[in-house]
Amino acid sequence: MSGETDRPRILLATDFSKWALRAEEYACCLAATWRATLTVLTVLEFPPGMNPEYPVNQVYLGELMKAGAKQLVELKARAAARGIALHTRIATGIPCEEVLAAVKAEDSDLVVVGTKGKSGLAHVLLGSTAERVIRTAPCPVLTVRMDSDDVSAAEAGPCGGISLNRILVPVDFSDCSLEAVEYAALMAQRHNASLTLLHVLEPVSYGLDFTLLQTGKREEIRERLTARLGDMTRALTEAKIQADSQVRGGTPFESILDSAKTIPADLIVMGTHGRRGLSHALSGSVAEAVLRQSRCPVLTVRSPKYGPGHRRVLSAMST
């Protein structure tokens, strides 16, 4: 097989607000680096209580369609100026449903959505769309946050200032977190990036009250986990990927955010199921807190991601 059917498929969901610019940058840059096909979707949503069947509202819908089509043409021109070809889609309806329908129709391998500034998921570009897409999309979802002070930089256009040199992957050794490591490894190969594997020693995760354990026991557990992470980093190194690992104590989401800031990470890749913490995806406090507060993009990988026929980068770490 050859042609576009072989290439990765990226879907960018946008409302064309200034907060969507950063997500546009990432979608275009990933499409260029991966040699992927890129589809841009915008969804026209009627205000609550407005019946689209009324003639006057049909006129309103026509104006929305005209404005949306114009914005898609402009985005396509911006991308074409950088050698990036893309397809466009425009839909009417409930944004989250239309995004998920487009994911299915396009058989997307990745969805890119944006979030606005400091309140994160409370102000997702498409209302509650990003949260619902992350919960239910069959493919990974890249959530790109944008703060007010990032807007002027993003207005430079796609691929301005984007780097994916350092990737952080929280690991709890569940199947889903190992699938996230696998996805991150593939991204690291594509972008010549380094990986940092992070395990947070949270007492509740192991059914233990560390305040009652002797220091020697705590160190024994830490050493065992450090050794296991060491095995994974060696497997990554054998795959020609620069990697290191960390074992930290504390509250999981705070440790993840602190590590991301310290590295500093350009991307966090997280599994959406697992033992605890990362296990509950958006319905749990850890991943939700990371998505709300992370200054760098967060890529969520829903498990199971890879079928038995997938040739893994980390064959020794197969789930």
Predicted segments, located by residue:
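Gly/Ser-rich helix-loop-strand patches that form or flank binding pockets
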Residues: M1-R9, C29-T33, L100-A153, D258-S318
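Small/aliphatic-rich secondary-structure junction motif
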Residues: S2-Q58, G161-T211, D244-Q246, Q293, ...
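Well-ordered alpha-helical segments embedded in enzymatic catalytic cores
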Residues: A23-Y26, Q71, E98, R228, ...
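A short acidic, glycine-rich active-site loop
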Residues: N57-K70, Q214-A227
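Short helix-capping segments at alpha-helix termini
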Residues: R78-I84, A235-I241
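Rossmann-fold cofactor-recognition segment
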Residues: A85-R89, A243-S245
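Charged docking surfaces used in two-component/phosphorelay signaling
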Residues: I90-V99, V247-S255
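Glycine-rich phosphate/pyrophosphate-binding loop and the adjoining helix
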Residues: T196, V200-T226, M232-T237
